[in-house]
Each structure stands twice: as C-alpha cells, then as structure tokens.
C-alpha cells in the first residue's frame, strides 16, 4: 500500500465511498484510492481514481443509481469550481481472481462519458484490456478506504499481460488524439516507459523519462504536455496538429519496437 501524498483523502473519494456503501452494502470487498492521489500527487487536472471491488455482479438498476449519484459529485471537465473529475471502476472479484486476460469490469464512471450518461446510457459490463493496467496500479500503489489491503484481494498482473494491454489499447488511444492532445501524448510516454522498463509511473514522471530519448524536434511538445499536466503552463494545441501527429507516430513506433 502507499502513503497519501498530501495527507488528505480527496473529498470526492470520501463521497464515493459513502455512495457505494449505501448502494452495495455487504457485497463490497474493498474500496481503494489509487492513481495520482497516491502516486506523485494530484495535478491541476487530475481525476480522482477509485476502484471498488464487489463479490457479485451489479443489477442494471444499481448501475443506473450509481451513475446518477456519481454525476452529482464528479466535476465536469473544465469546470471552474475546483471540483475534480471522478473515475470510478467497479469489478466483480470472481471475474479477475483467478486472473484472466482480458479482465472484465463490472462498471466504469468517467467524465468523458458524461454526454452518454446525460442521454440515459448506462455502462454495461465489458472486457477491457486497459483494466489490466488499472489493477496493476491499484495493487501496487493504493490506499484502502474500506476493506483489506488491495494486495490481499487482487492477484498480481503478469507483465506479459500489461504489455498485451498496452498493445491492445494503442489504436483506440491514438484515434482519440484530436482535442485530447495532452492526455494522449502523456499516456503514450507512460506506455513507452512501461514496455521498456516494466514500471508504471505518473504521466509527468514518464514524460521526464521519455524526453531524453526523443529527437530534438519532438522534445518541446512533450515538455509542453508535461508542464500543462503539472499546471505550469496553459498548453494550447491549435496549429500544432502536424507536429503532434509526428510525435505520436514516433512514440507509437518506439512502443511497438519495444513490444516486439
């Protein structure tokens, strides 16, 4: 487990715990805060990442109620009220222990899905390669908000499956680059570091790792993304699309080379 960076549990995490206790009751195995809050510290635009482990599948009505209640406490992207966005993942422990790839998630809440939620769509259970990385992060670096240490209820994710998850997630990530330049660039840097070193770090630390490995013409853009993530500059991407594409192509090729 990990120590909290700033010594304070984010308010949205506390509110999430209250909501899932109310909705799930005795079916909760554990609730864990992970991600930036416990690994490098929350940055200006960081989500609050919460993993909820339950012991059975969620009925449709429960997933609907969970979505509706999380929408009231999660900050919309770009809000000026200092309310952080939530990313809440729910898994049924029996679907991931014993381990199998790709892992199955029971539910996910994220602000990039708010438009779908507002239209009444509810996230269904699905197999998700990226969940392998989420579970590896949570098992290694998390704080229990409820229940035992995450390492006692989650099995270790094999590095081979983390590498498979990166390979399988790469196409969809790159397809979403327009309008999400910073996140895509930094996620690629983190993927590159992970497939090369086996470590999963924060996005800004991954960028610091990658910058010395880049050709000079790509360094500035990755550093802009890193500084924007840290709140050290107002990163603007208008007029830079061709350069962004070139950087993305370089990192994608580097990731694929490491995977092979």
Curated annotation (Swiss-Prot):
Record-linked CDD domains: NT_KNTase_like
GO biological process: response to antibiotic
Pfam families: AadA_C, NTP_transf_2
Top-rank lineage group of the source organism: Bacteria
Cited SUPFAM superfamilies: Nucleotidyltransferase (SSF81301)
Keyword tags: Antibiotic resistance, ATP-binding, Nucleotide-binding, Nucleotidyltransferase, Transferase, Transposable element
Recorded catalytic activity of this chain's protein: spectinomycin + ATP = 9-O-adenylylspectinomycin + diphosphate
GO terms assigned for molecular function: adenylyltransferase activity; ATP binding
Purpose of the protein: Mediates bacterial resistance to the antibiotic spectinomycin but not streptomycin.
Protein name as catalogued: Spectinomycin 9-adenylyltransferase
């Amino acid at each position: 487990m990990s120590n909290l960076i700033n010594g304070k549990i984010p308010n949205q995490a506390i509110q999430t715990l209250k909501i899932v206790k109310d909705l799930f009751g005795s079916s909760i195995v554990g609730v864990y805060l992970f991600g930036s809050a416990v690994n490098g510290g929350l940055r200006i635009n960081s989500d609050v990442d919460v993993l909820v482990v339950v012991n059975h599948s969620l009925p449709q009505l429960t997933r609907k109620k969970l979505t509706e209640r999380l929408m009231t406490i999660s900050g919309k992207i770009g809000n000026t009220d200092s309310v952080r966005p939530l990313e809440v993942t729910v898994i049924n422990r029996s679907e991931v222990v014993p381990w199998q790839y790709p892992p199955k998630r029971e539910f996910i809440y994220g602000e990039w899905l708010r438009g779908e939620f507002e239209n009444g769509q509810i996230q269904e259970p699905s197999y998700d390669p990226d969940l392998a990385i989420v579970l590896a992060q949570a098992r290694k670096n998390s704080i229990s908000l409820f229940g035992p240490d995450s390492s006692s209820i989650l099995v270790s994710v094999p590095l081979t499956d983390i590498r498979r998850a990166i390979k399988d997630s790469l196409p969809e990530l790159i397809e979403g680059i327009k309008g999400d330049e910073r996140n895509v660039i930094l996620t690629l840097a983190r993927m590159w570091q992970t497939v090369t070193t086996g470590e999963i770090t924060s996005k800004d630390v991954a960028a610091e790792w990658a910058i010395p490995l880049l050709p000079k013409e790509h360094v500035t853009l990755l550093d802009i993304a890193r500084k924007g993530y840290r709140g050290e500059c107002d990163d603007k991407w208008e007029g830079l699309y061709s350069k962004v594409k070139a950087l993305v192509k370089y990192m994608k090729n580097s990731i694929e080379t490491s995977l092979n």
